[in-house]
């Protein structure tokens, strides 16, 4: 199907919008004829915060490789024939080790599948998307990264907390409270974080909250600093 702008301009707005949307879906299907893996950020859980591009990909997927998402509604967008594979992680409970997830994505991509790797938040914000992208690149499997809304921004926003404010805060720091347990040394610079200005956002840190707070105050963070613990 072809559809140029001059043809669209001569139509009523409703029909033009339908044709553009149809063309977009056909282009998506064409791009997915070859095996490809989409590393898709699902956002913080509210289905309404998924991007339009993300929903289009889920609706066209042949295989959905998904994490422990907050909303099962996202899975219902996939076609009935779509294969659904759960690889989620909760604290120390992993359905599959990360290395096996990487291998699975490579295998599915090489098999010519249209794979959507559905990840909570944003793939590249503590989502291990970088590791999966590395594995796909090294294996020569085509992939694309689709950003999602990170909970580092959405969580505070839903709680009524702006991470920046022109009068009070012109920078923010995001760090993890859950590092790789196989690391020989921590790469988390809590001393530097304590001395940094602006809002400080810790993700995946409820189990380490007391230890991190003690470390930050030990490095000079003012104990009276306003703080919030946001969990859903």
Locate the predicted segments by residue.
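Polybasic, lysine-rich low-complexity intrinsically disordered segments
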Residues: 12, 22-23
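Class I S-adenosyl-L-methionine
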Residues: 26-47, 52-149, 154
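Residue-level signal for well-ordered alpha-helical positions
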Residues: 77, 158-159, 215
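Short hydrophobic/aromatic-enriched beta-strand-loop microsegments
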Residues: 82-89, 140-144, 163-173, 220-229
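Class I SAM-dependent methyltransferase SAM-binding "motif I" and its flanking Rossmann-like core
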Residues: 122-196
């Amino acid at each position: 199907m072809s559809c140029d702008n001059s043809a669209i301009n001569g139509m009523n707005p409703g029909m033009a919008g339908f044709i553009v949307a149809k063309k977009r879906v056909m282009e998506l299907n064409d791009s997915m004829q070859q095996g490809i893996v989409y590393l898709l950020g699902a956002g913080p859980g509210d289905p309404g915060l998924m991007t339009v591009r993300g929903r289009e990909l889920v609706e066209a997927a042949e295989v959905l490789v998904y994490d422990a998402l907050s909303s099962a509604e996202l899975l219902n967008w996939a076609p009935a024939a779509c294969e659904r594979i759960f690889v989620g992680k909760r604290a120390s409970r992993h359905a599959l080790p990360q290395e096996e997830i990487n291998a699975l994505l490579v295998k599915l991509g090489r098999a010519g599948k249209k794979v959507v790797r559905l990840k909570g938040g944003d793939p590249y914000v503590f989502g291990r998307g970088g590791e999966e992208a590395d594995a796909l690149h090294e294996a020569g499997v085509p992939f694309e990264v689709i950003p999602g809304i990170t909970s580092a921004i959405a969580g505070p926003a839903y709680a009524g907390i702006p991470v920046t404010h022109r009068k009070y805060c012109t920078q923010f720091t995001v760090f993890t409270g859950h590092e790789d347990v196989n690391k020989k040394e921590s790469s988390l610079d809590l001393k530097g974080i304590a001395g940094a200005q602006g809002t400080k956002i810790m993700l995946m840190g409820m189990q380490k909250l007391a230890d991190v707070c003690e470390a930050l105050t030990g490095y000079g963070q003012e104990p009276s600093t306003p703080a919030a613990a946001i969990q859903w």
